[in-house]
Structures are given as C-alpha cells and as structure tokens.
Amino acid sequence: MSFKGTTVIAIRRGGKTVVAADGQVTFGYTVLKSNAIKIRKLFNGKILAGFAGSTSDAITLFEKFEEKVKAREDGIIDIKRAAVELAKDWRSDKILHKLEAMMLVADSENILLISGTGDVVEPEEDVISIGSGGNYAYSAALAYMENKKLSAADIAFKSLKVAARVCIYTNSNIVLEEIS
C-alpha cells in the first residue's frame, strides 16, 4: 500500500515513547490542509496511535483498535494482542477490508505497525515510520539514533523535518505526542 499525504513516525528511547506526524492533507496534487492532526492518545493516554491514509478509515480503525484493547477481561493493556485481533478482522471483514489506511500504535513497551493486509510488524530497532515520507523519516531516524544525546522527541522531530524536505506530500507542521 502506498498513501500520499502524510508521514508518521514512532520512536522509543530513554523510557519515552513518541509518535509524531506532519500536518499535510492532499487531494490528488492539491494541498487541502497543512495542520491536520493524524495522531491521538487512546485508552486514557496509555497508547499512542498514528495513521496514514484516509481520515475516515483511520477513525474507524482507531475505534476498532480501542475496542480490541478494552475487550480483555483482566484489564491488562496488551497492544500486541489487540493489534493481531484488529489485523485479523481488518483482513477478513468485508467492510473493514476496504479501508485504506495504515496504523502505528505504541505504548511504553511496544511499537507496532498494523496494515490492512493483515500484517502486524514490531520493528527490530525502536523506530518505525509509515506514509509517503515514511522511508525518508525512517532512514533519518536510524542515523539520528546513533547520537545517544538526542531524545525520542528530538529524533522524531528532526526525522520528520528531513522527510518534509524531500517528500512533496509531507510538510513541517509537526504534531508530537509522548508517553513514559
């Protein structure tokens, strides 16, 4: 899947987890909005999520993901299990299967990419990125991760700035959320 119009990155470092995204929304070759919010805190601020793709589809997926997190009877938050359950539904449900979006979800211990093809990916490094500028931001973040003085927030911000310089569908209006 390839989506134009956004870049989202998730990073863990030093006990902090960050999800950040640019604010650009495009329709074809036209910029419609420069300050969209593509990330949100879920489950009372314990989980961060970001999306690339259709906004209405992403809202549906946020809601479905939150339902999967809440479904656990013992009250323990398990985003890995919730992500797998969402991916199974997303792939097999006739309506969900048509949704065009990708999600990054993260808590204080995990970062996961969830796709409509049924993939749930936990990155080897403590960084992952999606969207049209995702590869640029990911590459920059890997390089910035070598600098032990930079925080997760610094790396996310700098990486999105790099993506904004080379990806025409990514801008430098960055929104960042952080949890410990």
UniProtKB/Swiss-Prot annotation:
PROSITE patterns registered for this protein in UniProt: PROTEASOME_BETA_2
Activity regulation info: Allosterically activated by HslU binding.
InterPro entries named among the record's database cross-references: ATP-dep_Prtase_HsIV_su, Ntn_hydrolases_N, Proteasome_sua/b, Proteasome_suB-type
SUPFAM superfamilies documented for this protein: N-terminal nucleophile aminohydrolases (Ntn hydrolases)
Entry's EC annotation: 3.4.25.2
Annotated binding of Na(+), by residue: 164, 167, 170
Single GO biological process annotation from the record: proteolysis involved in protein catabolic process
Compartment(s) of residence: Cytoplasm
Keyword Protease: yes
Catalytic reaction list: ATP-dependent cleavage of peptide bonds with broad specificity
Signal peptide extent: none
Enzyme class per UniProt: hydrolase
Keywords from the named record: Allosteric enzyme, Cytoplasm, Hydrolase, Metal-binding, Protease, Sodium, Threonine protease
Entry keyword Mitochondrion: no
GO cellular component terms listed in the entry, alphabetical order: HslUV protease complex; proteasome core complex
Active site: 6
GO function term, MF aspect, one: threonine-type endopeptidase activity
Pfam family, one: Proteasome
PANTHER family with a match to the protein in the record: ATP-DEPENDENT PROTEASE SUBUNIT HSLV (PTHR32194:SF0), METALLOPROTEASE TLDD (PTHR32194)
Family membership noted in the UniProt record: Belongs to the peptidase T1B family. HslV subfamily.
Function: Protease subunit of a proteasome-like degradation complex believed to be a general protein degrading machinery.
Quaternary assembly: A double ring-shaped homohexamer of HslV is capped on each side by a ring-shaped HslU homohexamer. The assembly of the HslU/HslV complex is dependent on binding of ATP.
Protein name: ATP-dependent protease subunit HslV
